[in-house]
Amino acid sequence: ENCQVLKVNNPILTNTDLMKIKAMKVPGFKVEVIPIIYYKNTSLEKAIDRLFVEADRAYRDGANILILSDRGIDENHVPIPSLLAVSALQQHLVRTKKRTSVAMILESGEPREVHHFATLLGYGACAINPYLVQDTVKQLVDEHMLDKDYYAAVQDYNNAILNGIVKIASKMGISTIQSYEGSKIFEAIGIDKNVIDKYFTNTVSRIGGITLKDIENDVNELHSAAYLSLIHI
């Protein structure tokens, strides 16, 4: 009763898995979806601060499963980079002594490679729903570019990602995904010390580099390129 646990077979969630979690009505669990998108004329730093405010509000309201979602991106809204959002919120929850009371799930179109998932789990995510990958798989199946059932193809992808994460963890002497979560066993290269100290606290970083403003500019450039190309289609 005092230690209820939601168990999933794979930390890489299908769209159906996440839908079930969002709709869950089980005593002891309360789910809250927190957007990690922001208006494009807002600074990235303010957007992250707003994420902290929303997480604190959800915690006060009794939520113990936070789903960080970048769904809703449009021509006026850009996403906080998923790893930055996850790690920043992880550090905020640790500093405010809330981390052990809250699980963090990411719903994002950004992660697609094993390293993406490995870093997201390593910096605090408990599970990840790569919805854009699954939408892409569906399109490939529908266009007969993939000779496989959609659900089987998604399952194969999820298992391949999980096997890759397990391989990374095992090289570090970690035997379970649960032990790997939040372990921060990575070294950062090319990120400014202020960004590391504030959002990736205690991560080893011997070489400085891009600032938060540089990251914001990159996000805006990618967003503009995506929507300009759509306008010209």
Where are these regions (language model features)?
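Flexible, glycine-rich loop/tail regions that form catalytic "lids" or insertion modules at the edges
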Residues: 1-47, 54-58, 62-65, 111, ...
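Conserved structured catalytic cores and adjacent interaction surfaces
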Residues: 42-43, 50-53, 58-115, 122
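Glycine-/small-residue-rich beta-strand-loop submotif within the FAD-binding core of flavoenzymes
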Residues: 88-100, 134-155
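Glycine-rich phosphate-binding active-site loops on the catalytic face of alpha/beta enzymes
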Residues: 122-140
